[in-house]
Amino acid sequence: MAEDKFEQAKGNLKETVGNVTDNKDLEKEGQNDKASGKAKEAVENVKNKANDLIDKVKGNNDNK
């Protein structure tokens, strides 16, 4: 998950530098990096919630 945050930060930096230097390609690359990092983070969150739910269901079945 830290890698996803790093990718977002890197994207933010690229976007800012691209904006300041009027480099539209770098700005767009930064936007893409940020979006990719956010998407990966969202997928990781869904995986974690699914695993928590599976563990909870397994725990309830163990008590029966």
Curated annotation (Swiss-Prot):
Basic and acidic residues: compositionally biased ranges: 22-64
Region of interest (Disordered), residue spans: 1-64
Gene3D superfamilies per UniProt: YjbJ (1.10.1470.10)
Superkingdom classification of source: Bacteria
Pfam family, one: CsbD
Residues annotated as transmembrane: none
Family as reported in the entry's similarity comment: Belongs to the UPF0337 (CsbD) family.
Name of the protein in its database record: UPF0337 protein SH2043
